[in-house]
From Swiss-Prot:
Catalytic activity: heme b + 2 H(+) = protoporphyrin IX + Fe(2+)
Protein name, per record: Ferrochelatase
Pfam families in the cross-refs: Ferrochelatase
Organism: Rickettsia felis (strain ATCC VR-1525 / URRWXCal2) (Rickettsia azadi)
Recorded superkingdom: Bacteria
Length: 344
């Protein structure tokens, strides 16, 4: 009997207009994976943050058309992935998008899946590196709303997948300065509070694994590069070094800067405003060249990567499987928040 497969793409979500900025912020900060407090405290804090940050965030989104581009970009990735899979598999399939903090929410997507009536479901996060705050939160939220007895296969991460790495390398090579060896590559990832990592989250470990693989594939002798973290907010300790600080340092050294958004596969406010506008101003102050590598988007090699991962999971007979794209747990056992089973 031919399989009928529902594929669910997970992503963050974003406001579709300036009026939806506040509810988006509330949903984000009401997530227990983001603010780990019981109610009513988490609710109150989410209300306060979303209210106090609304106007500032609206001004930021007004710089990029008054909405998040991530919504449209995810639709384009869905279409590209659909076309690629149609060429390669005979099974019936449909791809659904589930955003975590804006529509389409899990309940709505699950209703659509029920109507489709699949024989199995594959969950594919558009977060290459796992974190309990991104993939972990999305998977948990989906499963909490899910009430059908059906096989679910979960792809937890793909930080070292061959074509994922090659897609980054191809975009970096397009922008490398042929006549300039005096540059520094900053691999900029979304930041997280240190306490989340100390609690067993493998995110920074997987970021390092991605960068290690990219640097190896680039094969540039004595490459000057650093891993940095952006979007730091509040007084608590965040992952270091901070992207802004490292741009400042490179500028003082008169090094040209190449920024690679290493944890983002879609353009959104953190790339289009933080990287392209705010951080570029720092480089401009020191009169050094500043080049930002695009996110992977619908890059053909990246779509090949997602396709390869899905084909691998479609062909697996295991039911209710949770593993990385390499079919093994890649995180050391100290990272207790990893979704994969512990290794012996």
């Amino acid at each position: 009997m031919k399989k009928r497969i529902a594929i669910v793409l997970f992503n963050l979500g974003g406001p579709k207009n300036l009026e939806s900025v506040k509810p988006f912020l509330f949903n984000l900060f009401y997530d227990k994976a983001i603010i780990n407090l019981p109610n009513p405290f988490r609710y109150i804090i989410a209300k306060i943050i979303s209210t106090t940050r609304e106007r500032k965030s609206q001004k930021i989104y007004s710089l990029i058309g008054g909405k998040s581009s991530l919504l449209q970009e995810t639709e384009e990735q869905k279409l590209a992935l659909t076309e690629k899979l149609k060429q390669l598999i005979k099974e019936d399939f449909a791809i659904f998008i589930n955003m975590r903090y804006s529509a389409p929410f899990a309940k709505e997507v699950i209703d659509q899946i029920k109507k489709y009536n699949p024989s199995e479901i594959i969950l594919l996060p558009l977060y290459p590196q796992f974190s309990s705050t991104t993939t972990g939160s999305s998977v948990k939220n989906f499963l909490q709303n899910f009430d059908i007895d059906i096989s679910i296969k979960t792809i937890c991460c793909y930080p070292q997948e061959e074509d994922f790495i090659k897609s980054h390398v191809s975009l970096i090579k397009e922008k490398l300065y042929d006549d300039d060896k005096n540059f520094r590559i900053l691999f900029s990832a979304h930041g997280l509070p240190e306490k989340i990592i100390k609690a067993g989250d493998p995110y920074s470990f997987q970021i390092k694994e991605t960068v290690k693989a990219i640097v190896k594939e680039l094969n540039i002798k004595d490459l000057d590069y650093k891993i940095t973290y952006q979007s730091r907010v509040g007084p608590i300790e965040w992952l270091k070094p901070n992207t802004e600080d490292e741009i400042e340092l490179a500028g003082k050294l008169k090094k040209d800067i190449i920024i690679v958004p290493i944890s983002f596969v879609s353009e959104h406010v953190e790339t289009l405003v933080e990287l392209d506008i705010e951080y570029k101003l720092i480089a401009d102050k020191y009169e050094v060249q500043y080049t930002r590598i695009p996110t992977l988007g619908t890059n053909k090699i990246f779509i090949n990567s997602l396709t390869n991962i899905l084909l691998q999971f479609i062909n697996k007979v295991d039911t209710n499987l949770v593993t990385s794209s390499s079919s093994t747990r890649i995180c050391p056992n100290e990272f207790t928040k990893c979704l994969c089973k512990l290794t012996n």
